[in-house]
């Protein structure tokens, strides 16, 4: 019994004294005590100034780009500074709740949970005895009473604002607007942030029923500024990876950083996913081993084939008609001449699927370009795999050199025999020739090798 107590005591000491090793995070918000990370506030400057000016604002960025991490950082910083009460509120549970009679009470419950469990409001209650039958005004009344009871101004950052739609969205914004315009006389929220994937201009597209019009007093006009959370720069990728080097001694050369940045273009989830795959899977956490550009290529291929949720959620969007209308001309290399105010065009940009680079619409990074092509041509490739044609790469190699004439001759014959049937299989029918070619080439390199594709917008080439 005595030995057991000593053992327990030792275990307790070891457990409490052990520092968790930091790692590259690819799931959920980042925590500076657990994860290697770049502070998100540096990628979205000017928020503090908007809060000081009592403004309501929007931050939008693609999924897994650091939005929630930014909000949690900001809430902690504001509360630590002591000038404001800052509250984080996720609206994710409101997904699909269109009816404001159900949606507004749910928003109030989310706020109540955040207030209760934060521990920052021990002597103040929120929405006690709230009249939920008055769903067109209960949110405003609850926030007004709460703000009146506080000694400091209240800042609320609403995450996952995209989850609101139709009646719930209108009732939510209208009550914020009503409180906003009268707050010089009646207490209300000092500053509000609405954070999601979309710019607020596109929230109007989520109002489907004609009777739910915005009217002349649009609730959207309370927003002073719309901001986005940019991707990492190459220098920030280097700084992020250097944190791992400082702890482990494992070095990332300039060539490795260049390769990672080229493949990811600084998209935060991809930047973390590539290095995590290299460090933990390819090199098996052996920090004595050097990281090479070849490891980057290997990690990228694994991520493409594995199709994590981050990749899969983007690929599911390709089925949407509004996405197809924008993406298909990019695949076929046509000069589309997009209207930069077109909702579908802006939707694709907001999702992070495409970027406008010097007036040319392109996939946001080579990884996205590759997964888009492979997704759209996957059925064709599987059919080729089962038929055994075309043969894999060795059949086209002569003394280690690719026999282009034989390869193209086989493709021409394949096209003559199959193109009419196969084109009907594609969702993106205009891009079918390009997709069949990519599937053909992917089948050829299955036994080893890679294809590097460039989408030549405006030149009708791949």
Residue ranges and their predicted role:
Residues 7-65, 69-78, 141, 145, ...:
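Walker A/P-loop-proximal flanking segment of P-loop NTPase domains
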Residues 28-29, 168-263, 277, 281-285, ...:
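The catalytic "switch" region of P-loop NTPases
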Residues 80-96:
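Conserved catalytic segments around the Walker B and adjacent sensor/switch elements
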Residues 110-158, 163-177, 182-191:
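Mid-core helix/loop region of P-loop NTP-binding domains shared across ATPases and GTPases
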Residues 165-166, 397-398, 417-435:
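A short, highly charged nucleic-acid-interacting micro-segment common to nuclease
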Residues 235-238, 242-351, 357-358, 386-390:
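Winged-helix-like regulatory helical subdomains adjacent to P-loop NTPase cores
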Residues 369-399:
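Short, amphipathic alpha-helical interaction segments positioned at domain boundaries
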Residues 440-462:
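Active-site metal-binding core of divalent-cation-utilizing nuclease and nuclease-like domains
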